[in-house]
Amino acid sequence: MQGPLSAWLVKRRLVHRSLGFDYQGIETLEIKSEDWHSVAVILYVYGYNYLRSQCAYDVAPGGLLASVYHFTRIEYGIDQPEEVCIKVFLARSNPRIPSIFWVWKSADFQERESYDMLGISYDNHPRLKRILMPESWIGWPLRKDYIAPNFYEIQDAH
């Protein structure tokens, strides 16, 4: 079954793949990395003016990584705003995706966290650097193939 956004994108010949609906009935679409920036701008123009969240996950050990976006179309007087989930799957060997910071400023820390934990590089992000781990940290802690170092820093409790 095709949702309203998917139907709208099909009419305009914009490449995407429908992944169905989640348990809340929110439409989920897959967009290719190379199409992501232009589709993001189109979503904003279409009315998705609120980036609810951005996250990322490791699909499988040695497999793809995914950058996930949840958008809401907030309009005055609407009780049930339209929502959509976008997934962009990336090769583990070179996980690069255009940043949407310049479209939704709230993507700033969220993209940095995905970079810090999974190593996804967001092209044209103004401050893409680690946000949770020290700059000297080696590796990407939330990848399923990550091997944790065999040391733990003991902090003074005083």
Swiss-Prot record:
Q: Which reaction does it catalyse?
A: a plastoquinone + NADH + (n+1) H(+)(in) = a plastoquinol + NAD(+) + n H(+)(out); a plastoquinone + NADPH + (n+1) H(+)(in) = a plastoquinol + NADP(+) + n H(+)(out)
Q: What does this protein do?
A: NDH shuttles electrons from NAD(P)H:plastoquinone, via FMN and iron-sulfur (Fe-S) centers, to quinones in the photosynthetic chain and possibly in a chloroplast respiratory chain. The immediate electron acceptor for the enzyme in this species is believed to be plastoquinone. Couples the redox reaction to proton translocation, and thus conserves the redox energy in a proton gradient.
Top enzyme class = translocase
Give one GO biological process term. photosynthesis, light reaction
The GO terms describing molecular function are: NADH dehydrogenase (ubiquinone) activity; quinone binding
* EC number(s) stated in the UniProt entry for this protein: 7.1.1.-
How is this protein annotated for GO cellular component? Answer: chloroplast thylakoid membrane
The encoding gene: ndhJ
Q: Record's Pfam families? A: Complex1_30kDa (PF00329)
Please give the subunit comment from the record: NDH is composed of at least 16 different subunits, 5 of which are encoded in the nucleus.
Say which domain of life the source belongs to.
Eukaryota
Q: What is this protein called?
A: NAD(P)H-quinone oxidoreductase subunit J, chloroplastic
Q: How does it sit in the bilayer?
A: Peripheral membrane protein
- What keywords are annotated for this sequence in UniProt? Chloroplast, Membrane, NAD, NADP, Plastid, Plastoquinone, Quinone, Thylakoid, Translocase, Transport
